[in-house]
């Protein structure tokens, strides 16, 4: 496959106004995508965005480019990424476009595409779009220009879809839940979903102003929701990221429940109901505790590369249904085509109701092993991971850890960093092992 120039593993992303994320590129990208997508004969594309102030600019540019290529555009306004995937399917659109940089700060933004079935756009189509980007923009004839309309009931449609994933004979009455929307795309969705299911909801991170998305709130900044759960005496907390495709949770003790623990809950619940197909897909960063806990239940576990795109690829290859990342991207292919933080939260709450159990009780059998991650910066073309010294240090640590530990060394995909991850039974021992390997990497750099 040819090397992609613009598209990364999750679309195009960067700092607004520099590099790739300019209105000029967005205009041309809309046109190029329109040229490729119109070949199928369908001429309808949906656009959604998160709450970044730059979203207005990129929405207008994409809209103009798609229209210039002859495609009709349907605007959703601020809506979660999984809502775009869902409504792309239900409106029988040729594609969905999301303007978001997910959990990044407000000054970043990104553009990613979904195919007509609500899954990430095929690599080959992205390459075709990149090829069109190299050509001069040519507008279709005036009578063929695309029209633009707005989906006025997008919010209500998606709320009903989310609620449909909760058992019809159950309610959340009696539960007090803190919901953190990260000042992002779920601010007008998530609190309503859980309230309509019967819960008492305390919403935080629900007042976006264009520049506060993910700012000390949301799934990547858990301190505020942990504190709020404790001060409000809530039963649990649900934290979403800026575009709503990621979830972290908090139990009544103010302890964070991460993506690995959520996967464990969902797998146990599916097995108990006899609907678990195959096993669970995690990533190279998934805690060894998840692997061991699933082994104890005879549930197969497989690891993909880091990234929800790779989790999805392995799920499809194995024909399994449940997978995700410890960072909170949760995939359940019986309930959607992409990571959906709200739906994942609903599925956990459904498991709690079915088993009449708390979050603490559902996660108790899974022992999270201490995990230490050390980032080591390197310069030049030399690969420190090929060093005999680094290999020797890794072998020494793996020998000492045995079956109750794990070492992972990998290069960052975005920075000149080697990530050293070590897991084991004792935090201090794991920290010492990680520093030993990190020192070897530094000396080899």
UniProtKB/Swiss-Prot annotation:
Residues annotated as binding Mg(2+): 102, 241, 243, 245
Changes after translation: Activated by phosphorylation.
GO biological process: carbohydrate metabolic process; peptidoglycan biosynthetic process; UDP-N-acetylglucosamine biosynthetic process
Chain positions with Phosphoserine modification: 102
EC class name: isomerase
Keyword check for Magnesium: yes
Annotated PROSITE patterns: PGM_PMM
Catalyzed reaction equations: alpha-D-glucosamine 1-phosphate = D-glucosamine 6-phosphate
One MF annotation (Gene Ontology) recorded for this entry: phosphoglucosamine mutase activity
Functional description taken from the UniProt entry: Catalyzes the conversion of glucosamine-6-phosphate to glucosamine-1-phosphate.
Name of the protein this chain belongs to: Phosphoglucosamine mutase 1
Organism: Shewanella sp. (strain MR-7)
